[in-house]
């Protein structure tokens, strides 16, 4: 029997975009300031991959690009696809997504004359890993080592050559871009499952439907949504004592928002 999702269930989209480089006239290499009259072509989105994230499941990613268009740098149709995809998204999963992917996507919506979308919460796997700390590198390639799905290197077209060959309409470069883009999304989904129990912050708000806790009279993990939580000790603050819980599925810790002495249902928040 198919389980019906709550009416306020989150829609979490794992996403990775690739952009064409900006083209400008320059006189030398090295650090320099480039004025707007030197720019010949601005950076545009040339491809993206995405998958719906669900804790404990790595779903196959889907891919879209401008490769077969007459003008590969005209991203208006691709951006419109992104706009449709994200209009109902409550959360976006992206590595360095807060600093790069979302600003580029939102800027593309503006540039293409589309309506603004309500900003989704960004589940940035790079920022979550930085919260944990102590890693030699926070690049996706490093953090996903040893995973079932790891970040793919584009060694067939190393460095910038993947993008330059893609723009030359090399079909092998398009195949490599598809594999590279899709692997990033699938690797991010697996990485999110690993860092989720360790991370904390307001980005988790809405991952668990509010109606779920009210209807079932049960505690739910605010990270993965599991009802399989166990009361483990208490958290004490100047305001009083709160019940603490550990999720038996993802391993994350959470606490009640209400004092222990109050006989009210518990709503959980990350700590």
PLM region spans:
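Short cysteine-rich clusters marking metal-coordination/redox-active sites
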Residues: 221-224, 247-250
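Conserved RNase H-like, two-metal-ion catalytic cores of nucleic-acid enzymes
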Residues: 2-86
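Cys/His-rich microdomains that often coordinate metals
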Residues: 225-229, 254
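Short linker/helix segments within small regulatory modules
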Residues: 233-244
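Short metal-binding segments enriched for Cys and/or His
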Residues: 249-270
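Conserved DEDDh/DEDDy metal-dependent 3′-5′ exonuclease domain
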Residues: 56-147
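Acidic, Mg2+-coordinating catalytic module of metal-dependent nucleases/exonucleases
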Residues: 93, 142-214
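Residues immediately within or flanking Cys/His clusters that coordinate Zn2+
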Residues: 216-218, 244
């Amino acid at each position: 029997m198919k389980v019906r999702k709550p009416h306020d269930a989150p829609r979490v989209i794992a996403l990775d975009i690739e952009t064409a480089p900006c083209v400008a006239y320059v006189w030398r290499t090295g650090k320099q300031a480039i004025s707007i009259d030197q720019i010949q072509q601005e950076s545009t989105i040339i491809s993206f991959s995405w998958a719906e994230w669900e804790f404990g499941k790595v779903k196959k990613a889907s891919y879209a690009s401008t490769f077969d268009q007459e003008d590969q740098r005209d991203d208006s149709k691709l951006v419109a696809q992104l706009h449709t995809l994200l209009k109902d998204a409550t959360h976006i999963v992206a590595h360095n997504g807060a600093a790069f992917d979302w600003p580029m996507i939102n800027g593309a919506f503006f540039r293409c004359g589309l309506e603004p979308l309500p900003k989704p919460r960004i589940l940035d796997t790079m920022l979550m890993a930085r919260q944990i700390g102590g890693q030699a590198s926070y690049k996706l390639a490093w953090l996903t080592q040893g995973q079932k799905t790891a970040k793919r290197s584009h060694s067939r077209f190393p460095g910038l050559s993947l993008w330059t060959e893609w723009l030359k309409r090399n079909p092998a470069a398009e195949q490599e871009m598809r594999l590279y883009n899709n692997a990033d999304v699938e690797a991010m989904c697996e990485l999110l499952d690993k860092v989720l129990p360790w991370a904390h912050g307001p980005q988790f708000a809405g991952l668990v439907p509010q109606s779920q806790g009210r209807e079932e009279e049960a505690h739910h993990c605010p990270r993965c949504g599991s009802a399989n939580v166990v009361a483990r000790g208490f958290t004490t603050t100047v305001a009083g004592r709160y019940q603490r819980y550990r999720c038996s599925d993802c391993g994350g810790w959470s606490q009640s928002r209400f004092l222990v002495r109050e006989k009210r249902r518990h709503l959980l928040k990350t700590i």
